[in-house]
Amino acid sequence: MKKILQEFKQFAMRGNVVDMAVGIIIGGAFGKIVSSIVADLIMPAVGLLVGGVNFTDLKITLKHAVMEGDKVISPAVSINYGNFIQVTLDFIIIAFAVFLLVKGVNALSKKKEEAPKAPVAPPADIQLLTEIRDLLKNNK
């Protein structure tokens, strides 16, 4: 049992796992920010532009609620396509942000790859043989 715990500790403390965990936490927080931007800023403005529509209220009612006084006997059944539009916009914004991030990382890695490497000097024995060859060519 102790060996399994040690192996798990080694696995959990590797750089990739910790980096991934940090990425997931930051990604979750970023998703909440984007959702708030879409729900609280973008969708009200879009709704105002298209005639004061609240997108979260857009739905197709398949079955109306059955009420008895103030008591709901059977809830309404509806297709909430307005909420779907809002969530789709969330996804598009997050996907675009991730695309820009990946594009930036790829550009940085290309710059690192394209940096010219200094030519490696040949070993001393190869240099000596090259000098001997050149001297023999010049003496002919």
Swiss-Prot record:
TM region positions: 11-31, 82-102
Single GO term (MF): mechanosensitive monoatomic ion channel activity
Localisation: Cell inner membrane
Gene3D superfamilies cross-referenced by the UniProt entry: Large-conductance mechanosensitive channel, MscL, domain 1
Entry GO terms, CC: plasma membrane
Superkingdom in the source lineage: Bacteria
Topological relation to the membrane, as annotated: Multi-pass membrane protein
InterPro entries: Mechanosensitive_channel_CS, MS_channel, MSC/AndL, MscL_channel
Keyword annotations from UniProtKB, A to Z: Cell inner membrane, Cell membrane, Ion channel, Ion transport, Membrane, Transmembrane, Transmembrane helix, Transport
One of the Pfam families matching this protein, by short name: MscL
Function recorded in the entry: Channel that opens in response to stretch forces in the membrane lipid bilayer. May participate in the regulation of osmotic pressure changes within the cell.
Subunit-level organization: Homopentamer.
Name recorded for this polypeptide: Large-conductance mechanosensitive channel
Protein source organism: Parabacteroides distasonis (strain ATCC 8503 / DSM 20701 / CIP 104284 / JCM 5825 / NCTC 11152)
Classification of source organism: Bacteria, Pseudomonadati, Bacteroidota, Bacteroidia, Bacteroidales
Gene: mscL
